Regions:
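Active-site neighborhood of HAD-like aspartate-dependent phosphohydrolases
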Residues: 1-54
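Short helix-terminating capping/connector loops at secondary-structure junctions
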Residues: 3-4, 47-50, 91-96, 128-133
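Conserved Lys-Pro-Asp/Glu-containing loop-to-beta segment of HAD-superfamily phosphomonoesterases
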Residues: 8, 110-150
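Short, flexible/disordered intra-domain loops and linkers
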Residues: 24-31, 63-75, 108-111, 143-150
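Substrate-recognition element of Asp-dependent hydrolases with the DxDx(T/V) motif
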Residues: 40-77, 95-107, 138-141
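Short, electropositive alpha-helical surface patch
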Residues: 63-90, 115-124
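A short acidic, often aromatic-flanked loop/helix-cap motif at beta-alpha or helix-coil junctions
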Residues: 105-112, 116, 169-172
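Acidic, Mg2+-coordinating phosphoryl-transfer loop and its flanking beta/alpha structural elements
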Residues: 136-172
Length: 172
């Protein structure tokens, strides 16, 4: 896959872009995360022409309004940290944004593997995107042995964009 021509990145959040500091599957609180710099460094190395960085995440565990407000602060902070880091190394990064889906309903258009989050971001920035050929998604739900699902991979496939598992990306 030719990463150098990719200008638009959709990236999963949990276990892809961040991991918990506690080592637990689910965070203890909104501060229990560490941005995965090896992932950002690999993006810088492989995608020097990146213009757009979009975080897309299923968050079915968010039940209360307070949980959602706190998570919104968390994902905004992560987006800001990542965008600042990437912009310090990449000359072309223009846009960073995020969307997350709190629904556990598998038919919700925004819940991966459905494509609603990608469609919304693509539509919001479409005047700056030449083609879906410029897009790629990185995730950890790839249907590999030990993965809990293949929702990231299926989401990218249904949206007709390239996909790579974060573990494979780090080894590339």
């Amino acid at each position: 896959m030719d990463y150098k021509n990719k200008k638009v990145l959709f990236i999963d959040l949990d276990s892809t872009l961040i991991k918990t500091i506690s080592g637990k599957t689910f965070p203890e609180d909104i501060t229990d995360f560490r941005v995965q710099l090896p992932v950002l460094d690999k993006i810088i190395e492989k995608m020097p022409n990146l213009e757009m960085f979009f975080i897309v995440s299923n968050q079915g565990g968010l039940k209360t309004l307070t949980d959602k407000r706190l998570f919104n602060s968390k994902i905004s902070a992560i987006e800001s940290i990542c965008a600042s880091y990437l912009r310090s190394k990449l000359n072309n990064l223009l846009y960073a944004d995020n969307l997350y889906c709190c629904s556990t309903d598998k038919n919700n258009t925004y819940r991966k593997p459905n494509t609603g989050m990608l469609e919304q971001l693509y539509y919001n920035y479409k005047y700056n995107i030449d083609s879906k050929d410029d897009c790629i998604m990185i995730g950890d739900s790839s249907g590999k042995p030990g993965d809990f699902s293949d929702s990231d991979k299926r989401c990218a496939s249904r949206f007709f964009i390239d996909y790579i598992d974060v573990r494979d990306f780090l080894e590339s």
